[in-house]
């Protein structure tokens, strides 16, 4: 309905141009918004006020001209002018009911799919050789929700898990493994849990021993030069680390696979060429022995240009170099239309600089869009970055295990007689859903407080509330299995039926916001509002005890569409649903 309203306004504007009321070359972005007050209709636009200067008329006069030139539409019941010149559209109830019937019979809930694009999504991307910690949670689950949403909207999505599988940390690990095997024999085993210990011990040795640090640096060079022994160990470290990552992904219900991994090492062969190409274009400068690029748009507090360091004085490459190589690959090989980067907001300047430089150097197609989807930090209840009681980094697996334990206690307290296996399965779904939803429901650019107590509550905008709302709606059908809905039609008569129908019709608008702006919290807010609208409808409008058979069937269809929408929405967030809680 929103796009239909915009098209009506576009036709009216064209008519005004033809009549000479508005200059023919006038360009206007027609904005249509949902009204907050139903007495003001369903949609409102400020188009008349945008045309005031161009038409040299007052806004209410222009608003009337716009209305006079609107094409006839069976979808619109009436149009009114409000305030200084807003135009309010009231949607016809029968048109809304027909839209809901179409949604009920559609694989995409009636959502109009945009033109398909190829979209690269860079997310999760942990540094290997360490266990994943809570700092990896936001990129992983926000990115995955947007990926699911993009695919639902018909786009071709290429997942890119740009893992940190190269660099100094591997030199430290290789040097430490040499020492370990010298002491324990060539067959010293590497186990998953050892990686953290290896890394910590290697870091201590690296910081304390100059000999060890020099050895580690030499091993990095050997690794980069293709040394067979170093490469074998490097692959072993990576394989163990990736196995751990994918255990986490599976537990989280994230769609990343091994085939989506394309780490920093993938671009090693391109780094020298990146430097050479920047140099050939005269973009490189030298600063303290390093090769850098200065861009006038980026300055420090003193007004001096900020450098993008491309190659260190010792010949080593940096994130900017590998990011430039990755951008070139994503543009020219993958032929992407958009590339979305789900990386901490603290990297905003870095991405602004490399995005600009890649376009300046013509490494990427001019029409391709590069978008940093930054996010804030997850904090403890003290408002500081989330830590263990001892002040250490919280391992992601430990967080998920605690969520399982707390969810099991919660579910058992509400279902003391339930079978233990069923309790465990419900707790698994509720625990993971609660952790994910608590994050996804927050605006990604904001920091947020992590609280098990809040996220496991059955009240408010939480996963348990929405999961229960779904089971409640689904439960209606279990009690109505004998009702034949083949000839049923949705009819909107009661105010609460219309409110629920209006909310159901907004799903497509919300999905466009999720995929265009990378904002899953908009979908969370919508699902919470939808559950509330259904609750109000269910209290005011008896379903199985409706006055007539036709009314009962109509309300069952509304409940069915609500259940489909809740389930689809939760799935797009990466949350499983339950038929019973």
UniProtKB/Swiss-Prot annotation:
<keyword id="KW-0963">Cytoplasm</keyword>
<dbReference type="Pfam" id="PF00750">
    <property type="entry name" value="tRNA-synt_1d"/>
</dbReference>
<protein>
    <recommendedName>
        <fullName>Arginine--tRNA ligase</fullName>
        <ecNumber>6.1.1.19</ecNumber>
    </recommendedName>
</protein>
<dbReference type="GO" id="GO:0004814">
    <property type="term" value="F:arginine-tRNA ligase activity"/>
</dbReference>
<dbReference type="Pfam" id="PF05746">
    <property type="entry name" value="DALR_1"/>
</dbReference>
<dbReference type="InterPro" id="IPR009080">
    <property type="entry name" value="tRNAsynth_Ia_anticodon-bd"/>
</dbReference>
<keyword id="KW-0067">ATP-binding</keyword>
<dbReference type="InterPro" id="IPR035684">
    <property type="entry name" value="ArgRS_core"/>
</dbReference>
<dbReference type="InterPro" id="IPR014729">
    <property type="entry name" value="Rossmann-like_a/b/a_fold"/>
</dbReference>
<keyword id="KW-0436">Ligase</keyword>
<dbReference type="GO" id="GO:0005524">
    <property type="term" value="F:ATP binding"/>
</dbReference>
<keyword id="KW-0648">Protein biosynthesis</keyword>
<comment type="subunit">
    <text>Monomer.</text>
</comment>
<dbReference type="InterPro" id="IPR005148">
    <property type="entry name" value="Arg-tRNA-synth_N"/>
</dbReference>
<keyword id="KW-0547">Nucleotide-binding</keyword>
<dbReference type="InterPro" id="IPR036695">
    <property type="entry name" value="Arg-tRNA-synth_N_sf"/>
</dbReference>
<dbReference type="InterPro" id="IPR008909">
    <property type="entry name" value="DALR_anticod-bd"/>
</dbReference>
<comment type="similarity">
    <text>Belongs to the class-I aminoacyl-tRNA synthetase family.</text>
</comment>
<dbReference type="InterPro" id="IPR001278">
    <property type="entry name" value="Arg-tRNA-ligase"/>
</dbReference>
<dbReference type="Pfam" id="PF03485">
    <property type="entry name" value="Arg_tRNA_synt_N"/>
</dbReference>
<dbReference type="InterPro" id="IPR001412">
    <property type="entry name" value="aa-tRNA-synth_I_CS"/>
</dbReference>
<dbReference type="GO" id="GO:0005737">
    <property type="term" value="C:cytoplasm"/>
</dbReference>
<dbReference type="GO" id="GO:0006420">
    <property type="term" value="P:arginyl-tRNA aminoacylation"/>
</dbReference>
<feature type="short sequence motif" description="'HIGH' region">
    <location>
        <begin position="126"/>
        <end position="136"/>
    </location>
</feature>
<keyword id="KW-0030">Aminoacyl-tRNA synthetase</keyword>
């Amino acid at each position: 309905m929103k796009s239909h309203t915009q098209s009506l306004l576009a036709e009216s504007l064209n008519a005004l141009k033809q009549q000479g009321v508005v200059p023919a070359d006038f360009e206007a972005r027609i904005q249509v918004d949902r009204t907050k007050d139903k007495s003001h209709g369903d949609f409102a636009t400020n188009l008349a006020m945008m045309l005031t200067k161009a038409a040299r008329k007052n806004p209410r006069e222009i608003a009337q001209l716009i209305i006079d030139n609107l094409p006839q539409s069976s979808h619109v019941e009436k149009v009114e002018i409000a305030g200084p010149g807003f135009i309010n559209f009231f949607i016809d109830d029968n048109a809304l009911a027909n839209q809901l019937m179409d949604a009920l019979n559609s694989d995409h809930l009636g959502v109009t799919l945009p033109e398909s694009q190829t979209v690269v999504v860079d997310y999760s991307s942990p540094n290997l050789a360490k266990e994943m910690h809570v700092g990896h949670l936001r990129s992983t689950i926000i990115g995955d929700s947007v990926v699911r949403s993009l695919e639902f909207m018909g786009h071709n999505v290429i997942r890119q898990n740009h893992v940190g599988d190269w660099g100094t940390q591997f030199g430290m690990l290789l040097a430490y493994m040499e020492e370990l095997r010298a002491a324990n024999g060539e067959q010293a085993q590497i186990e998953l849990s050892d990686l953290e210990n290896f890394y910590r011990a290697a870091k201590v040795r690296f910081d304390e021993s100059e000999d060890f640090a020099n050895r580690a640096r030499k091993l990095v060079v050997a690794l980069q030069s293709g040394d067979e022994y170093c490469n074998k160990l490097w692959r072993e470290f990576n394989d163990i680390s990736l196995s751990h990552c994918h255990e986490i992904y599976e537990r989280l219900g994230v769609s990343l696979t091994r085939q989506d991994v394309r780490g920093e090492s993938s671009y090693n062969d391109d780094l020298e060429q990146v430097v050479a190409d920047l140099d050939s274009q005269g973009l490189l400068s030298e600063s303290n022995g390093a090769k850098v690029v200065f861009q006038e748009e980026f300055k420090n507090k003193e007004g001096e240009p900020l450098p993008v360091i491309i190659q260190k004085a010792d010949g080593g490459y940096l994130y900017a170099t590998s990011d430039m190589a990755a951008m070139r690959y994503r543009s020219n090989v993958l032929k992407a239309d958009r590339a979305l980067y789900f990386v901490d907001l603290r990297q905003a300047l870095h991405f602004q600089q490399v995005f600009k430089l890649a376009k300046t150097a013509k490494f990427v197609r001019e029409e391709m869009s590069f978008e940093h989807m930054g996010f804030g930090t997850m904090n403890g209840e003290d408002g500081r970055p989330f830590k263990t009681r001892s002040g250490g980094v919280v391992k992601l697996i430990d967080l998920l295990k605690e969520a399982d334990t707390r969810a099991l206690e919660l579910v058992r307290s509400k279902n003391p007689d339930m079978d233990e296996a069923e309790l465990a399965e419900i707790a698994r779904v509720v625990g993971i859903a609660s952790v994910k939803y608590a994050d996804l429901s927050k605006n990604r650019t904001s920091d947020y407080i992590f609280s098990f107590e809040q996220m496991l509550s059955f009240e408010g905008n939480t996963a348990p509330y929405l999961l229960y709302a779904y089971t409640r709606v689904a439960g209606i059908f279990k009690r109505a299995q004998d009702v034949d809905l083949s000839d049923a039609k949705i009819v909107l008569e009661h105010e609460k039926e219309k409110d629920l129908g209006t909310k159901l019709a907004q799903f497509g608008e919300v999905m466009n916001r999720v995929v265009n702006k990378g904002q899953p919290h908009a979908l969370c807010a919508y699902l919470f509002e939808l559950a509330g609208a259904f609750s109000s409808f269910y209290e005011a409008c008896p379903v199985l005890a409706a006055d007539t058979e036709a009314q009962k069937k109509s309300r069952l269809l509304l409940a069915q569409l609500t259940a489909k929408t809740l389930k689809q929405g939760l799935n797009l967030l990466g949350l499983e649903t339950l038929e019973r809680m």
